[in-house]
Amino acid sequence: EGGASKNYFSILAELIPDAYKFEGRSSRPAKDAFNAMLNYGYGILYSKVERALIIAGLDPYLGLLHSDNYNKKSFVFDFIEPYRILVDEPVFYIFSRHKFSPDFIEPVHQGVLLSTAGKKFLAPLLLEHFDEIIRYRNKNRKRLDMIQTDAHAFANFLIDKRENYLETSINRKLQNFLNSNFADNGEEEC
């Protein structure tokens, strides 16, 4: 996963105008404006994923791919991966179309954070992008509704309602994880 992520962000860095180049992913604090926007956007997305998991009856603290530590919302970290593109696309748009303004960031010790002006600019763009209607699982849905649909599908999979289980990469990984762990332990599958 780490290698793919590194390649993905190095390609993104090559595609945006030279004025906004960055050296891969960085957080806490971001080392550049692109990462500052991603960090803020992912923060919004984390809350949307956590909400979807709770509504579906899933424990956001359960760790399947990330460590199971009850002080961390590990399942949110697991489940968010295929949906990061919901933030990546609008952030890439901002930089590739020269919509970024220097007043969108403010310096902090060893990095930058999104300023109030940056948050006011990015948040509505993200929410508009989340609300766009797309075709997903043979229905017209808001982009953000993909997360809720997949969370319910995963919960149904766990209670053996497997009809039309989603074929997203995260769900295949989780299914393989569950199958291998239960098979190795000699226990029945959930």
Spans of features found by a protein language model:
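Active-site helix-to-loop segments that bind/position phosphate- or nucleotide-bearing substrates
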Residues: 1-190
